[in-house]
Design a protein with these regions (language model features):
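Glycine-centered tight beta-turn/hairpin loop motif at sheet-sheet or coil-to-beta transitions
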Residues: 26-28
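Glycine/threonine-rich beta-strand-loop-alpha-helix active-site module
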Residues: 111-128
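Metal- or metallocofactor-binding catalytic centers and their adjacent structured scaffolds
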Residues: 36-112
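Short beta-strand scaffold segments in enzyme catalytic cores
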Residues: 20-24
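Acidic, glycine-rich active-site loops and adjacent beta-strand->loop/helix elements
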Residues: 12, 37-39, 120-124, 134
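Short, Gly/Pro- and small/polar-rich lid/capping loops
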Residues: 1-19
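Mobile "lid/hinge" segments at catalytic clefts and subdomain interfaces of large enzymes
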Residues: 124-152
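Short helix/loop capping segments that flank catalytic or ligand/cofactor-binding pockets
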Residues: 30-32, 43, 141-143
Length: 152
């Protein structure tokens, strides 16, 4: 797959907080992904951005066309090339948005839906619905003195 252009910009998430959006342009179209920040942060959680959202955006937007031509991504496992290139230059949220956009482009390149591309021909199974029942931690505000001490 030939990537013609990669572009990043700042958008706002559902809580009106800034986050990153990355678009990847190929011959098959434009593929866009974003990665909102969580409200709380675990002690083992990766940093969403290296130093700042704007620094990650600048790094992605300054990827030279010469470098894009060298990146040959045809399969899921070849995303390691992107990770090696971007490591120590962008944070986890930026990398997620970038790789998600590339995955969408790869799926389109093979004329598949994203779920079909990721399942690699394995039989279809219905997903199990997952949802929050208890909104504890930083999400439990508003219970007026009855906030749970834990977060699901």
């Amino acid at each position: 797959m030939k990537i013609q252009k990669i572009e990043a910009k700042s958008i706002v998430d559902s809580r009106k907080e800034p986050t990153i959006e990355v678009s990847v342009l190929t011959q098959k179209g434009k593929f866009i992904s974003s990665a909102p920040n969580g409200k709380s942060k675990g002690k083992f959680e990766a940093n969403p951005y290296i130093k700042s959202l704007q620094q990650d955006i600048n790094f992605i937007n300054n990827i030279k066309p010469k470098i894009l031509r060298k990146l040959k991504i045809e399969e899921f496992k070849e995303l390691k090339e992107i990770e090696a290139f971007a490591e120590k230059n962008i944070g986890a949220n930026s990398l997620f948005a970038l790789e998600s956009s590339i995955l969408k482009a790869l799926a389109a390149e093979q004329e598949k839906q994203l779920w079909e591309f990721l399942s690699r021909g394995k039989p279809k199974k219905l997903p199990y619905p997952v949802g929050n029942v208890v909104g504890g931690g930083l999400h439990g505000k508003g219970f007026k003195g009855k906030e749970p001490d834990f977060q699901e």
